[in-house]
């Protein structure tokens, strides 16, 4: 497969994550360069990380789009106030040094026009945290490649942040955001029951995300999506089932170039997860159904991006030699405008490196100030000068902020002062420190035949490309000096002297920037001032190792020298000349060595050549003017947007392998490279312009010369509609893309007058097929918030027309044979020969063996086979004819072959079905319900016992009080007894009263005990009735659930069976194809004419055999399916038969329980009574009857742990 990879890439990109401190906001002081006024603000970031916004003391909110942020700097790298008064204002009353609390946020629409947001934090830690977080958000690759839905959410967030001081959303902001058609906006607002006057405002709570979505649907209706939705099965019903959605994703959205083992099609469970994520109606989602609204959300969601996130991530092998990569390279990096006049800028080095460039150019000249500081400028022009030291500091600051891979510094050294060159070398050593690669790596010595180290080996390293000082004899040096002076007339190549030994650093005049064609005036103009370089001093020469510039002489000489550390630069005209004359040799040269291409000197406007020209030859450092955002620069940005924006892209395999030769001008398919076929249909656009204008779309393809098609397609211009134009035109088809790994598709949108709106550049290899939104970018490759195109893309491996019939016959032989039979019947009326054959076929007296004799091929004449019939044999003849060579003759063998691919499929048993997750989940739920029911009844029992205990205590207290009173009276009476006048009848009366009191107390306790016993019986009966009812319901639900589970599992098994059948057919074809190949191999040993005869016969017989075998296999598969379906019915019936059995068992169980219950309660109370009697006899003189009833029943209900320890089958759960 074209898209197959050795392994599945594990995505390393992190989604946007905004920290709490950024969401809550922090106090800062904002200051301006040109003002002494400072403004206290509260700085925040929205939860999605779209905007950076702040509120001042007047409650006014300002926004900064994080997609415009280039860098965030703090401490010594941040801007510091120059005005002493301003500095004093900022430093008042704050903790920590002012320099450590400074933050500068750099933002702008491009690399040249940048602005600064200057802030001061109140604490150093806060400054560091905000700097790191803001930079992380601004450079997040997933945020730069958001889904369509995320961009619409960004627009919504912008509206929610730009509110009035009262917290309301001004409608003028909505009109301004969707300004293309005011009337449409007004109608859409009214449809949402919102005010529509431009001067109105609405409360934030009235403009919810749901209302916003309805507003968008009214503003930009999408009938084309309704049509797609209907086309895929939602014609009679307002939804797609999970199976229909699965077919849509696997058949339309999946890349057919991917390996099916490493990247299998989505399964039903995975599609169900997607439906649950995007379907707003939960009841539909649970049924596995998705509405048109959910379908629209899926199409605009993160899973349906036009480019896979894996391609954005660092997914290429970074361990190959440096020469195997394209390297993002800049020309005259310091310039901000044209080549002849304008400003040079240190900031350009920062911006270029932050954008992903890995090779920058430094034009160094002698400083003419008293300090003798070297400068960087464009020599002999009106461009300004900048400090060399400041440039080195800027490079050190930003070298590895966005990519860890090596930086290449391309020095164009015109400094003829040894002292200043020494300063340059010293600055490089001191400022770069350990990052500067001073010595070659041990594994990669500077020797012939040794490849360059890899980007992985050189991570976080800076390499210098500069002339290397020679260590030859003084005579040689003298000659070289003369030559060097003469070389001032050269323009961009190297010296005429060639090193005499293979040692490193032998060519101080072997500049990559001297032109060997020095007498050619035009060439000199093309190549600029690079040839006037000064001699390298010892100090600068010592910095050079793996990138040693030499004069290019020929590809043959370079091959003989075989020095990977030597490289040459070519002005674009010279590079084009070499590419035209020796394309294959140029590709070979670039496999081992580096080459750098740069714009010709006549491009004074800083325009660019097309980099694709030189990528096609494998040139690594194709240097462009980054300050000019023309089409060439846009293609360059599109190229290096992928592989983690690392600045390195691995070249196609054929441009790396030493055993393969590649011609960039090839027009045919290259053996070993799978070409692609790409089809693009532009369906519609959304919010393309903020004006009411017509729009159109253009499609280009860039790649090898054979693949490149400029303005290959252009749609019609929509009539005054930029909100939702629909084109629905025929797709543009790129039939054969020879080298897809180096081809890119550009889709651009323009207003009717030709004004550029936006575009997108997509590598062919990374494009996902299917229905997708393409969110547009501006010229600087920054994402636009609202403009998008909706397209349908088909991409697949290319099949030549000549093989289309063979591919069709092999992939679907039955349909192919049926088609051949149909054609035979259509031709039968035109040929007498065919009529005779039909008559013979109808003749009952003809023997089967005679029929095929007429169709046998005659001996070959001059290598061409002749047969008696031009059409395939009718099926009746094919069935009765004798087996052709290579066919399976014996039926037993046929059955053996079929049995070898036929898989045994067993139906799931009831026990296996009961282990299904949904059934087990329901069982657990029922178990919990029964536990809760028992707990409730235990609580009622406890409450009842508490109530009776209280009543008992009251009776006992009353009894004790009355008894105490009587006993007190008895004591008094006893005293009186001692007096002679006291009557005896008083004491007898008191005894009677005490006896009566005891009798009354005993009766009350007996009554209370009887009442307690009855109430306990009632409670337990109530519990049993509840349990019985609940278990009866549980049986119904479990039987129903088991039935549903059985149906679902059986349906899935039948679906799986279809997949198994297809695999079995493929396996059968594979085995038969193996036999066919063996026979073809055998036939190769014979003479050519005989071999051709047998090969033709083999193909014919092979197709017939495959048809017969597949028919037999299908019969066997059909019997297997019938048997499985029968077994499924049997299992479902067994499940239904379980229900009455379980219900009878339940009835019997509770009849027994009810019978035993009164006796159990009585025994229980009596047992408790005995225990309590013995207890009370030791502690109290009161009658113990009531206390006995509170024995065993008056205990806490069992805990959930205790209940879980019980047998659920016996206590709470149903027998099922």
From Swiss-Prot:
SMART domains: C2, PLCXc, PLCYc. Residues 316-467 form the PI-PLC X-box domain. Keywords: Calcium, Cytoplasm, Hydrolase, Lipid degradation, Lipid metabolism, Lipoprotein, Membrane, Nucleus, Palmitate, Phosphoprotein, Transducer. Residues 469-534, 834-891, 933-993, 1071-1095, 1172-1216 are annotated as: Disordered. The modification Phosphoserine is found at residues 236, 417, 511, 582, 887, 978, 987, 1199-1200. GO terms for biological process: G protein-coupled receptor signaling pathway; interleukin-1-mediated signaling pathway; interleukin-12-mediated signaling pathway; interleukin-15-mediated signaling pathway; lipid catabolic process; memory; phosphatidylinositol metabolic process; phosphatidylinositol-mediated signaling. Palmitoylated. Palmitoylation at Cys-17 by ZDHHC21 regulates the signaling activity of PLCB1 and the function of the endothelial barrier. Palmitoylation by ZDHHC21 is stimulated by inflammation. It is an enzyme of class 3 (hydrolase). Residues 980-991, 1187-1198 have a biased composition (Polar residues). Its EC number is 3.1.4.11. It holds the Pfam family PLCB1-4-like_EFh. Interacts with DGKQ. This is 1-phosphatidylinositol 4,5-bisphosphate phosphodiesterase beta-1.
